């Protein structure tokens, strides 16, 4: 499946990534992307920036190297109440919010605890996508959470770095099952490289293969085209971005 948008990338601002936004944009262009989301880790992750960093993304140009830039964040799920570590004042300056479990922030627990947290994240309304859900350290009720995500138009991320098998070990088969359930429930799927170095931006080959094997319809993959991604943002209640009228 062709994927023209990468919704999960990091710059050196995350504290453990190694490229600038301009370097990421250059690689995105070389790798055939039309658009990507810049989604550095939010402040509870060791080494991550203060929330002002995310609020000030309003100064970023909408295109770098002729690639569209989506202003985003990978926030941390903090507790079972579904709170995330982004100050509410930042929301108006962001286009895209991922919420993910990370071991340094949320101590792995049991299925019931993780499920409760994810359901409350979804219902809280601030989050557009759930990141790298395949991690076996954060097992959850796939059916219940993905059904809730489908009902609230929250996208399920399939993460290319996870599928390489070196990070979040034990996730690959779980990602296939998550994709199968998302297909059955009619949930939206998003695709992220989770690049921590510029050459990986737009590296979505393993995700593309998975989606093909599972038989997910491209109409439910919001990263199939920039038009589909922007339509999803509007569906989520976000304002249209004037500079992206070129994609209409």
From Swiss-Prot:
Enzyme class label: hydrolase
GO molecular function list: phosphatase activity; zinc ion binding
UniProt keyword annotation of Hydrolase present: yes
Assigned EC number: 3.1.3.-
Required cofactor(s): Zn(2+)
Binding-site positions, Zn(2+) 2: 16, 41, 196
GO biological process: bacterial-type flagellum-dependent swarming motility
Keyword Membrane listed: no
Comment on bound cofactor: Binds 3 Zn(2+) ions per subunit.
Any one Pfam family match given in the protein's UniProt record, by short name: PHP
Positions that bind Zn(2+) 1: 8, 10, 74, 194
Residues making up the signal peptide according to the UniProt record: none
InterPro entries given in the database record: Phosphatase_YcdX_put, PHP_dom, PHP_phosphatase, Pol/His_phosphatase_N, Pol/histidinol_Pase-like
GO CC annotation terms, alphabetical: cytosol
Annotated residues for binding of Zn(2+) 3: 74, 102, 132
Alphabetic keyword roster: Hydrolase, Metal-binding, Zinc
Protein family according to the UniProt entry: Belongs to the PHP family.
Protein name (Swiss-Prot/TrEMBL): Probable phosphatase VS_II0429
């Amino acid at each position: 499946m062709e994927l023209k948008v990468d919704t999960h990338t990091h710059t050196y601002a995350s504290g453990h990534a190694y490229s600038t936004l301009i370097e990421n944009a250059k690689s995105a262009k070389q790798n055939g992307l039309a658009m990507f989301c810049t989604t550095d880790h939010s402040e509870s992750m060791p080494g991550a920036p203060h929330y002002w960093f995310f609020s000030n993304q309003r100064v970023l140009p909408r295109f770098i190297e002729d690639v569209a830039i989506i202003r985003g964040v990978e926030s941390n799920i903090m507790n079972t109440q579904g709170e995330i570590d982004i100050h509410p004042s930042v929301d108006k300056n962001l286009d895209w919010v991922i919420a993910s479990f990370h071991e340094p922030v949320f101590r792995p627990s049991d299925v019931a605890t993780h499920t409760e947290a994810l359901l409350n994240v979804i219902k809280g309304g601030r989050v557009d996508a759930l990141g790298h859900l395949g991690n076996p350290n954060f097992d959850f009720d796939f059916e219940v959470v993905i059904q809730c995500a489908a009902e609230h138009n929250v996208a399920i991320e399939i993460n290319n770095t996870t599928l390489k098998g070196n990070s979040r070990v034990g996730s690959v088969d779980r990602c296939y099952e998550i994709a199968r359930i998302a297909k059955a429930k009619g949930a939206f799927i998003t695709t992220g490289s989770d690049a921590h170095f510029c050459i990986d931006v737009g590296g979505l080959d393993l995700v593309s293969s998975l989606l093909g094997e599972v038989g997910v319809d491209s109409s439910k993959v919001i990263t199939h085209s920039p038009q589909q991604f922007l339509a999803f943002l509007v569906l989520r209640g976000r304002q249209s971005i004037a500079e992206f009228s070129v994609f209409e």
